[in-house]
Regions:
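Cysteine-centered iron-sulfur cluster-binding motifs in ferredoxin-type domains/subunits
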Residues: 1-17
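Iron-sulfur cluster-binding electron-transfer modules in prokaryotic oxidoreductases
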Residues: 19-233
Length: 233
């Protein structure tokens, strides 16, 4: 199955059939009976080992232009994915420093405001750290203390998609422990997939899996009056 568990079919179904939850349950059953697929094993290896992920990403920028060398010369895909046009278009150039290296783990805010946690996800951490940096610094500019634990890992969405229930439990426990050190009042994220996974809104999961409310950064900024501040400029 190529289902991404996006839930689009569920929202459009007049009978609200939980197709994403059914697909996820079937994948867990298949994995339990036959073991992980080849792709599932690769997903588990990457998302379950942060050190390996960092190592592979360091060399990915150099290898990216080679990913499409086997496309037939007659294929129109070469116009879109040729090595000459690939850089900066289809795959972003990997930055020299990831988000963990760009921002501190804790930023002290105003004493009368609570601590908010930041869950960046692998995309903002390793591919778009400049966006992740804004995710960290904007709440701080609003006076909040910001906790960005460097022990956090993958949200578990790839593991859920591959039917790897045990890895989901491992990642969830790791992330719970990572944020427990500062006990934030809520956790902010800018990744829709991470938010859905951590809020328990994907494939029939229920409840905030980290034990803390997870909020999209845009909703947080609106709730804190940023729209009114921008309108007044």
């Amino acid at each position: 199955s190529l289902c991404l568990l996006c839930g689009s079919c569920v929202t459009k179904c007049p009978n609200r059939v939980p197709t994403d939850a059914i697909v996820a349950a079937l994948r867990r059953q298949i994995t339990g009976e036959h073991g992980l697929s080849a792709i599932g094993k690769k997903v588990a290896t990457l998302t379950g080992h942060k050190t390996l992920m960092k190592t592979l990403l360091k060399g990915a920028d150099l290898l990216a232009p080679l990913l499409f060398t086997k496309i037939p010369e007659s294929s129109g895909l070469r116009l879109r994915f040729s090595p000459e046009t690939l850089k900066g278009r289809s795959l972003p150039p990997l930055p020299e420093r990831n988000l963990f290296a760009r921002v501190p783990e804790f930023l002290q805010g105003e004493p009368d405001k609570p601590v908010v946690g930041i869950f960046a996800g692998y995309g903002l951490t390793y591919l778009y750290p400049q966006i992740g940096e804004l995710l960290v610094r904007l709440p701080h500019r609003l006076g909040y203390s910001v906790f960005f634990p460097k022990a956090q890992g993958c949200c578990g969405m790839p593991a859920l998609s591959s039917g790897n229930a045990s890895l989901i439990d491992t990642l969830t426990q790791n992330n719970r422990q990572a944020f427990a050190a500062r006990q934030p009042s809520l956790i902010l994220t800018a990744c829709a997939s991470c938010q859905g996974m951590l809020k328990g809104e994907v494939a029939g999961r229920e409840g905030h899996v980290l034990g803390v409310e997870v909020v999209d950064i845009h909703q947080f900024l609106v709730d804190n009056g940023l729209a009114e501040q921008l309108a007044a400029l």
